[in-house]
Amino acid sequence: MQVGVLAVQGAFAEHEHVLSELGVPCIELRNAGDLNKHYDALILPGGESTVQGKLLRDSDMFDTIKSQIEGGMPVLATCAGLILLAQHIEGDDTVHLGTLPVTVKRNAYGRQLGSFHTEAELRGIGEVPMTFIRAPYVAEASPDVDVLATVDDKIVAVKYGSQFALSFHPELDSDYRIHKAFVDSIQ
């Protein structure tokens, strides 16, 4: 089993570190040619969703990644990755991959100074540390989307089919249970 980590921008190295600590092989997906390599699951890291969306299109990766996700490839998306998956972005007509039937509010927690760390219950895993950096949250979710966690009555973690999307950055904490649960769901 091998995980492909989108490595065009953002916190991809941190996800790779966690996978390495768990003994899970991974490859960086930097261009369209990398999408021809073998990988069983995908991580869409945090970063800047607008930049990531543009780079996916400019590098001819967009359609292939969208097709893989629509075809059931397991995906773990964090922060900007959640925005990439969302079908709707509040106050913005931009649609990126659009495979997750939710509406997100971008930068919901403000600028860098609005960033924070907390702990909350993530259904199926338990209480986990959550680091929010200019994070989005899910403002609306389709009834078939499984809400896994809320913070201050805001949806911050969802699952839809094989898509697992988080507002926060588990890769920035030393608790690897979220990545382990994701990897375990693939095998």
How would you label these PLM feature ranges?
Residues 8, 78-80, 100, 134, ...:
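A secondary-structure boundary/capping signal
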